[in-house]
Amino acid sequence: MQAPPPEHCPGVESEDAGKGSACSGCPNQGVCSDPNKKLEDPGKALVVESMKDVKHKLLILSGKGGVGKSTVTSLLARYLARSNPDSNFGVLDIDICGPSQPRLMGALGESVHQSGYGWSPVGIEDNVCLMSIGFLLGSVDDAIIWRGPKKNGMIRQFLSEVDWGNLDLLLLDTPPGTSDEHLSVVSYLKDDTNSESLRAVMVTTPQEVSLLDVRKEINFCKKQNIPIVGVIENMSSFRCGHCGNTSEIFPAKTGGAPAMCAEMGIPLLGSLPLDQQISKACDSGEDLTEFKNVTTEALEGICSKIMASFS
């Protein structure tokens, strides 16, 4: 068993692994400095064992912050669960420094419990469960100031020490960019015996500043051989609740997600509106999908395409 990494550990993938000043005196120094040994991560075998009953995994990615990845993740999970009552769904919040799912899913103040099989995720509905570092903090205002190795260790624990049980689909809410969290979760799930079930969905807003980073995320998935189910354009338009007119709050100067999808050969799953009801539901944690509205109409088509991609 490897000892916990020191506070300023450069990480096993770094050129300084086992050689940096922080490595002096670390019991893992010999493992990290040996190019053969450092590739052997005992945590990977634990992840494979823990995830053996999780049929499919779906990464919710963007590259850009503020486009609504977490909101879209919660909406997808709840709509999928409501429209597939005989299936089981899980949500894993791997945005370690900015966990949003406890609030979005109406689970603020909940805590996880240890069982003989590991951490028990928090039940949201009969067929939806959630795990987030937000459940492990003393206060919602606590800041998490961690370097890469500690984040990676936390993600490994979420994948190997949470009792997910039998899930038809696990949705993973990710932070912006292609950082430690992304590399860590992909490295573990691609080593899963059912790695073919790992796919990704991109979330973007219509403006080019968002699309620029989504293109990078698409290329990240291509380099990692992760199939992309498609792209969701969030906040695509706004319909006034008084006059009923529709306007573009974020104009698509370069054609928005449809043009990017055509350019890169990626399916467009659909568009979600900028909806005041979504904003209110995010703050209160209530389930918006139990009501018929413009958002749930859009979710119906998006979710059917996602489920079809795994069949």
Swiss-Prot record:
It holds the Pfam family ParA. [4Fe-4S] cluster 2 binds at C240, C243. Residues 1-21 are annotated as: Disordered. Its cofactor is [4Fe-4S] cluster. It is found in: Cytoplasm. Keywords: 4Fe-4S, ATP-binding, Cytoplasm, Iron, Iron-sulfur, Metal-binding, Nucleotide-binding. GO terms for cellular component: cytosol. The keyword Nucleotide-binding applies. InterPro entries: AAA+_ATPase (IPR003593), Mrp/NBP35_ATP-bd (IPR019591), NUBP1/Nbp35 (IPR028601), P-loop_NTPase (IPR027417), YlxH/NBP35 (IPR033756). The keyword Manganese does not apply. Belongs to the Mrp/NBP35 ATP-binding proteins family. NUBP1/NBP35 subfamily. This is Cytosolic Fe-S cluster assembly factor Nubp1 homolog. It comes from Drosophila sechellia (Fruit fly). The gene is Nubp1.
